[in-house]
Curated annotation (Swiss-Prot):
The modification Phosphoserine is found at residues 62, 227. The modification Phosphothreonine is found at residues 35, 64, 232. The lineage of its organism: Eukaryota, Metazoa, Chordata, Craniata, Vertebrata. This is Aurora kinase B. One of its GO terms (cellular component) is spindle midzone. PANTHER family: SERINE/THREONINE-PROTEIN KINASE IAL-RELATED (PTHR24350).
Length: 344
């Protein structure tokens, strides 16, 4: 179904607003376990929004859910408990009054965004995600703003950050790690097919849905690059690939390096090149000074070693990550029926 473009004017300058259908960063910080209820059975990330059982999502005359196309104000929402705090604002659990649809409402302060000079980055995030609809990518349903704030209506990820779960358990087992690798490979293949490079895959930027399914979030460093070649440095120190440290041109293969680092961290509990100083970390990354504890299974070592290659062209392609024997033997990826239909 063709989606209707959000007609809100962009609050900065004369540029027109991007589409209201996109995915944006959400860093959800939780202190208490989630207790699913009828109101927390929310939509899957790549399908039309659905309300809780016994409740109906209101649609407009074209059959498109209102949450995607309607002009909202803050008065249209019941605001619940805070989910997280960030540099530019806060995230709250919220319910749209008309449809009772549960969302995460991210409230950004214009003054802080302007102070840090990141208006362009915010707009870029929205533009990049305008057409990314995938079961393992967090979705942005809509946005609106007033004189002081910008509000992003996001998919709610009830189980919060992957980072928090990793902190609690220290390491993940083979099944959970392989499942995450398959989910990531599939989602990134989708992104790369649309010429989108994430560039900052790490546990803090990965959220978990109701059934534990992965949701890629925080596209703050991502870029839509038709040439797929850029030279700017970004990302998290422990996850930076050699080509970015060395200031060389890079492409979508930076994401292959990142998921190799992630796989190692999930199994071991810390990134592979972590050191006491930044300079030492840089040195180890550039030299690909990779050492495995005896606890890392041989199959996982093989996968990680094929991803963490200094030469980007030698890194294992995403399709082969999904098909890797260790991933195939251990992954327990489960998609909702509607998601299976859409990615078939």
């Amino acid at each position: 179904m063709a989606q209707k473009e959000n007609s809100y004017p962009w609050p900065y300058g004369r540029q027109t607003a991007p589409s209201g259908l996109s995915t944006l960063p959400q860093r959800v910080l939780r202190k208490e376990p989630v207790t699913p209820s009828a109101l927390v059975l929310m939509s899957r990330s790549n399908v039309q929004p659905t309300a809780a059982p016994g409740q109906k999502v209101m649609e407009n005359s074209s059959g498109t859910p209102d949450i995607l196309t309607r002009h909202f104000t803050i008065d249209d929402f019941e605001i619940g408990r805070p989910l997280g705090k960030g540099k530019f604002g806060n995230v709250y659990l919220a319910r749209e009054k008309k449809s009772h649809f549960i969302v995460a409402l991210k409230v950004l302060f214009k003054s802080q965004i302007e102070k840090e000079g990141v208006e362009h980055q915010l707009r870029r995030e929205i533009e990049i995600q305008a057409h990314l609809h995938h079961p393992n990518i967090l979705r942005l349903y809509n946005y609106f703003y007033d004189r002081r704030r910008i509000y992003l209506i996001l998919e709610y990820a009830p189980r919060g950050e992957l980072y928090k779960e990793l902190q609690k358990s220290c390491t993940f087992d083979e099944q959970r790690t392989a499942t995450i690798m398959e989910e990531l490979a599939d989602a990134l293949m989708y992104c790369h097919g649309k010429k989108v490079i994430h560039r900052d895959i790490k546990p803090e930027n990965l959220l978990l849905g109701l059934k534990g399914e992965l949701k890629i979030a925080d596209f703050g460093w991502s870029v839509h690059a038709p040439s797929l070649r850029r030279k700017t440095m970004c990302g998290t120190l422990d996850y930076l690939p050699p080509e970015m440290i060395e200031g060389r041109m890079h492409n979508e293969k930076v994401d292959l390096w990142c998921i190799g680092v992630l796989c190692y961290e999930l199994l071991v509990g810390n990134p592979p090149f972590e050191s006491a100083s930044h300079n030492e970390t840089y040195r180890r990354i550039v030299k690909v000074d990779l050492k495995f504890p005896a606890s890392v299974p041989m199959g996982a070592q093989d996968l990680i070693s094929k991803l963490l290659r200094h030469n980007p062209s030698e890194r294992l392609p995403l399709a082969q990550v999904s098909a890797h024997p260790w991933v195939r033997a251990n992954s327990r990826r489960v998609l909702p029926p509607s998601a299976l239909q859409s990615v078939a």
